Amino acid sequence: MNTKIKDPALLCIKEESMSLSDNTDKTDRPMCPVTTVDTVHGRSLLMSKAFTPQALFKAFHDLKKPIRFKESVQKYELNAFRNIAEFISEYQNGTYRLHRGAEFNLSERGKIRHICATPIYDRVPIRSFCDNIFIPSLRPYLIYDNCASLKGRGIDMQRNRMKVHLQRYFRQYHSNDGYILQGDFSKFFDNLDHNKIVKAISKKIKDTYSLEFIKMVLKSFCLDFSNCSDAEIEAYRNGIKIINSLNFRKANTNTTKTIGKGVEIGSEVSQIIGVFYPYRLDNYIKIVKGCKFYGRYMDDFYIIHRDKVFLENILKDIQAISEQLGLHINFKKTHIKPLNHTFIFLKTKYTLTATGKVVMSLCSDTFKREAVKLRKFKKLYLNKRLTLDTIISQFKSWRGSVTRRQFHNYKAVKQLDNLFFKLFNLKYEDLKNGKSNKQK
């Protein structure tokens, strides 16, 4: 009599291993521990929660939604069960290692960032680990006004929390007299210390194999300091000099000079570490100092208070705690401003009026960039490199993201509408329908 197999993925473990769906390099990357089986409990927390076939397939199903058009994702999906089973087999045998992904520089409004794209073969177990162990274990220790990279929160919520804090401040003091301290960390992700990260996480996650998996991921972030002298390496290690990942290349197994600092922008583990790691700072400001009107979005934070001297003193405390964490405050972007003046937080302008109204508006640069983009689209359209329907879809998407926030930018939006209609000889009905039957 044939036995019924409940999970198709379990069949694939005994089958011949297939080649990786994407041509990523498995060399020069850290390996997992030799064994993952807990002899006391039978299975580790990783294997019982995060690395089951069901959990891994769900993780792949969730992460593929916005990137399904990519070739590597489609190849992985063709043999998803076999790829998952292959990973489970490699992890249990202690032969699994992370793959080297694509690296590139991204210019974001003139600021260059070094991005490391994690291959899909590694993104699946990392996503499952984050969803089932990492985030549930660390989220209870995060304050409510820490909104980055968490499900149910995000940048819109953080902007709204700033608005709520301004409104509550006015209700409490019946005035817009006061001050706001805005702070920022220099090269936040590049200078996160691996040992301090593991020490902080180990207080919240007790499973040995989960910690080993985190160490393996962190080790893959190491940079190559072979071109630096011993004195320079020591200065980087002790935090005397600030690390900039743009000046270093990725380390490999042959690299003798590495520093356990820095995490990649692009990995989900990095995002959660960035949210969690300064939690001591959040708790000190919120609980010890009693600052109700405080919020942090990754490396940007603010404190609203009536007393300027209080903010100056707490800034010194923040600097002391940051030095213990190995973080560096960017004093060019850290300042104290009067609350009745307009200030910018997360690319949004805030003004607390004398009547208690909070006026929110997008920065003018947002509309200038879109105007430049539309003029470039016009040239591409005339050269038949872009279709009119594609341009309409892009503008509708941008316009919807601006108008749904209900900011005070009505005139600027109308000016962009008029420019769009003039450039492409369209009417509002064409924008509303989203399709154009005109042949240019």
Residue ranges and their predicted role:
Residues 2, 30, 118, 123, ...:
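Right-hand nucleic-acid polymerase module
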